[in-house]
Structures are given as C-alpha cells and as structure tokens.
Amino acid sequence: MNFAKISNELGFQGLEYLQGSYAGGLFGRKKEITLKGMKELAMDLNKRAEDYGMENILIMIDIGPDLGSKVDNLDPYYPWIDCASEMNCHSVRVNLRGSDDDLSQWTQNSIENLSKLCEYAKPLNINVIVENHGGFSSNADYLVNVIDNVNHENVGTLPDFGNFCIKQDPKKSEEISKLFIQGGKKDSTRPPTLYDTCAERFDMYDGIEKLMKFAKGVSAKTHGFDSNGNDVDIDYKRMLQIVKNSGYSGFIGVEAQAFTMDPIEAIQASKKLLLNSYS
C-alpha cells in the first residue's frame, strides 16, 4: 500500500498496479474480492496516488482463466476492469499464454476472449492490452495476428523488452530459480538472468518493432547490469530508438528483474539506464 509513496520518492510520475498484490489477486490472502471491496480499494489507491501527485496508468491482471484457452466465462476480469475505470487508468493488461501447442486454437480463443473483454471495457473508456508474456504470446507475429483480428479500437499491446521467451529450458530454469532464492552470484562479472533460462525466443528488437504499432504502454524490463550500468542482455539505446521511431509518446514503465541486486537499487539503476538511453 506504500506503492505511491515509494514511487514518488524514487522520482516516478505514473503507477502501474500489479493486481496480484491485492485482495482477490494472485498473492492476496483472499481468493475473491467483493464489489464493495473493489470500490473501497479503488478509493484508497486513488487517495494515495493523489496525495503523492501520481497518475494511475494501468492494472496488470494475472488472475482468471487463461485467455489463450477455451473459457466458459470471463467474470474474474470484469471487477478489475471496473476498478481500472474507478481509478482513471487507461488500460488493463492481460495475458495470452495458452495451455497447449495448438496455434490455431490459441489464435481463435485469444481473439474471442479479447473481443469480449474489449466490448465490456469500451463503455468504461478502458483499453485491453496484451503483453508478450510467454508461450505463443511471445511470438510477435502470432500476437500481431490476434490484435489485427480483434475488431475493437480499445485493444492494444504492452510491449515488454525482455519477454520474448517462447519456450523455457527446464534444467536452466531450475538452476536460475535456485539462484533467485539465494540472491544470485553477487561476485559474477555477468550476473545470471532469467534470459538464460530460454530455449526458444523471438528476436527482441524485431518483436518490439512489430508490437509498437499497437502499443498503449511500454514495459522497459532490465535483467541485470554490467560495470557501466548497461543491461547485460538488452541494448537499451537500440530498443528505445525503436520506441521513438514508432511515434509512441506515453509512459514507459520500469520493471527490474536483476535478482542479484536489492530491489530498490535495481529500480534506480533501471531508471538511470532508461533516462540515459533515451536521447
């Protein structure tokens, strides 16, 4: 609940909320949240944002049925779209990972489910945006095809610099997970990152360029830093030039995954890299 305060102290201006952090979310103690509880949450977060002069940008939804799969109902999503509207956010972010290897079925399911959410969100002036976030959704060509076939103006993307891993290497994932728990190898010249767990990936620069056409937000992810403060996996100057060339002028969110660092220090290093690279 100190999100607005800490973000303000770190020099940020906008807030992207992780729905899983609140009641009814992925990490919340309560499995569900009532309509009354949702309104109270929105009022509380609005007050905190206002107190610190912050702008509410979007809510990232990580609970509910997989939108890349066949879904009976989308009820878990609707309260969070309502909440985003109450908080004057412009978007909710959803995922389209899918649960099998059937590309055709994933495409059909994704189009149908996104269309339904967009229909619900449109009267509330909320965009429904998709992040490249694993599985088929990390293949920019596949995701662009889905967005192209959702006939709603309030559909879009949230391109993430580092999320182009289509398939994980189970052994490497286990190794990195252990390092994550331990805090990583702090004396390493190149810190281990989640990028190392990937067995199949889409080219990140090509992917960002393709997804920026539909972008209503951007997630600047960092994996780790070298001695010069540059990301060890991502060429930030190249990536941000792609963002600039697209004509995008909205907020750029900071997401730090440098698990060998203190979280606040990683966020500060990410912000510094972002500002230094955006020239």
Regions found by a protein language model. Name each.
Residues 1-21, 87-90:
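Catalytic domains of carbohydrate-active enzymes, especially glycoside hydrolases
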Residues 4, 14-15, 111-241:
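Acidic/histidine-rich catalytic cores of soluble enzymes
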Residues 4-5, 40-159, 165-166, 264:
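Active-site acidic/histidine proton-transfer and metal-coordination neighborhood
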Residues 12, 54, 89, 215, ...:
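A structural motif
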Residues 15-16, 57, 92, 218, ...:
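Hydrophobic residues within beta-strands of alpha/beta enzymes
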Residues 16-46, 98-102, 227:
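Glycine-rich, proline-tolerant flexible connector loops at the mouths of alpha/beta enzymes
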Residues 251-258:
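Short acidic/histidine-rich active-site segments
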Residues 263-279:
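C-terminal helical cap(s) of enzyme catalytic domains, especially alpha/beta-barrels
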